[in-house]
């Protein structure tokens, strides 16, 4: 019976104790209780845990991810020197979207000391666009209206390109994901007119973009500091952005071989990055 319980759980990790109980039931053997099933699984080290949420990746995109990872597996700082990494991110004015915990004595649930203040409608947020290279931090641009193809082009024309020419030089390679506004004809025409080279990028691959961890670094540096309004929040973000040392950037670029290897090992599925 124990062997059947473990086999059933390993065949499909999403099966519940009730599912396994029904699957292994046999007319010639007693039906194990759900408690027995759980105990056997725990003894074998198979504990029930909330699964990590990762985006679904199609077979076509998995193959493209593996191919890209293999092609760039051995690239280091020198190979990435002319590449500009970019992305957009949202930051809340009044804390994060995640769950928070508090340690409090029994009976003190409603004490102000142990409360987590909230603001109606979430308190607002600030959208930003940023970029960086292996040799320098790029600008952080505030997005104050709907981020469409026209504003995206404006960011390139007035912010990204002037900075890139001054800090990276001509012949830079720009990285972006495959969001529809990024790949629109309007934006593609701008790249062609300005002779900007694009890095071929596999869809559904945030784990290959090191800037994702730069957003986490920015959030960590703010340390939950609150802002009274959107202007104050952006000032906080910009100051923290400028204070990020190059040692952090170097670590992110140096992580690229590991990111690529992780994608290869996972056969294109989402990785821990």
From Swiss-Prot:
Please give the superkingdom of this protein's source.
Answer: Eukaryota
What UniProt keywords are attached to this protein's entry?
Answer: DNA integration, DNA recombination, DNA-binding, Endonuclease, Hydrolase, Nuclease, Nucleus, Transposable element
GO BP terms: DNA integration; DNA transposition
User: Predominant location of this chain?
Assistant: nucleus
Q: Where in the cell is it found?
A: Nucleus
Q: Which InterPro entries match?
A: RNaseH_sf, Tc1-like_DDE_dom, Transposase_5, Transposase_Tc1-like
Residue runs in coiled coils:
none
Record's Gene3D superfamilies?
A: Ribonuclease H-like superfamily/Ribonuclease H
Cellular component annotations (GO), alphabetically ordered: nucleus
GO terms, molecular function: DNA binding; endonuclease activity
Protein function: Probably essential for transposable element Tc1 transposition. The insertion of Tc1 is the main cause of spontaneous mutations. It is an endonuclease which can produce a single strand nick at the 5'-end of the transposon.
Miscellaneous: The N-terminal region of Tc1 transposase has strong affinity for double and single-stranded DNA.
**PANTHER family reported for this sequence:** TRANSPOSABLE ELEMENT TC1 TRANSPOSASE, TRANSPOSABLE ELEMENT-RELATED
Could you say which protein family the record assigns here? Belongs to the transposase 5 family.
Instruction: Spell out the protein name for this chain.
Output: Transposable element Tc1 transposase
Which organism does this record belong to? Caenorhabditis elegans
Gene name tied to this protein: tc1a
């Amino acid at each position: 019976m124990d062997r059947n319980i473990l086999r059933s759980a390993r065949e499909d990790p999403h099966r519940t104790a009730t599912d396994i109980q029904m699957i292994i039931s046999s007319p010639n053997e007693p039906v194990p209780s759900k408690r027995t099933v759980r105990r056997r699984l725990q003894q074998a080290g198979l504990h029930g845990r909330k699964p990590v949420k990762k985006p679904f990746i199609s077979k076509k995109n998995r193959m493209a991810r593996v191919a890209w990872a293999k092609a760039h597996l051995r690239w280091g700082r020198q190979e990435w020197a002319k590449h500009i990494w970019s992305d957009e991110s949202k930051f809340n004015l009044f804390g994060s979207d995640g769950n928070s915990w508090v340690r409090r004595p029994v009976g003190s649930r409603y004490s102000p000391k142990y409360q987590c203040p909230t603001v109606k409608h979430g308190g607002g947020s600030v959208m930003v666009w940023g970029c960086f290279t292996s040799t320098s931090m790029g600008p952080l641009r505030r997005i104050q209206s709907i981020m469409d193809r026209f504003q995206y082009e404006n960011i390139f024309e007035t912010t990204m390109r002037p900075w890139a020419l001054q800090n990276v030089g001509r012949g830079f390679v720009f990285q972006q994901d495959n969001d529809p506004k990024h790949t629109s004809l309007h934006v593609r025409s701008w790249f062609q007119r300005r002779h900007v080279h694009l890095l071929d990028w596999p869809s559904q691959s945030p784990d290959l973009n090191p800037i994702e961890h730069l957003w986490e670094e920015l959030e960590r540096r703010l340390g939950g500091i609150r802002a009274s309004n959107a202007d104050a929040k952006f000032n906080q973000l910009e100051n923290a952005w400028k204070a990020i040392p190059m040692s952090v950037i170097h670590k992110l670029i140096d992580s690229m071989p590991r990111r690529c290897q992780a994608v290869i090992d996972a056969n294109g599925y989402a990785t821990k990055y």
